Curated annotation (Swiss-Prot):
The gene is rpmE. Keywords: Metal-binding, Ribonucleoprotein, Ribosomal protein, RNA-binding, rRNA-binding, Zinc. Binds the 23S rRNA. The lineage of its organism: Bacteria, Pseudomonadati, Pseudomonadota, Gammaproteobacteria, Pseudomonadales. Belongs to the bacterial ribosomal protein bL31 family. Type A subfamily. Zn(2+) binds at residues 16, 18, 37, 40. The keyword rRNA-binding applies. This is Large ribosomal subunit protein bL31. Binds 1 zinc ion per subunit. Gene3D superfamilies: Ribosomal protein L31. InterPro entries: Ribosomal_bL28/bL31-like_sf, Ribosomal_bL31, Ribosomal_bL31_A, Ribosomal_bL31_sf.
Length: 72
């Protein structure tokens, strides 16, 4: 690595809206406030909802499926 071209990379305190606090390194340089973290995000907590994408796709196909069909 070249000398004197890299930005300052200090440790910063990160605070989540759920109250979880941890430290990481960032070029931002100040304390960070975030909305979600691994302690409160639904994917990590196991409280994830499964969306019914199959039903939504079928509803779209029913409404617009024949839109591009050529008439005989």
């Amino acid at each position: 690595m070249k000398a004197d071209i890299h930005p300052n990379y200090p440790e910063v305190a990160v605070t989540c809206s759920c109250g979880n606090k941890f430290e990481t390194r960032s070029t931002f340089g100040k304390a960070l406030a975030i909305d979600v973290c691994n302690e409160c995000h639904p994917f990590y907590t196991g409280k994830q909802k499964t969306l019914d994408t199959g039903g939504r796709v079928q509803k779209f196909a029913d409404r617009f499926g024949a839109f591009g069909a050529k008439k005989a």
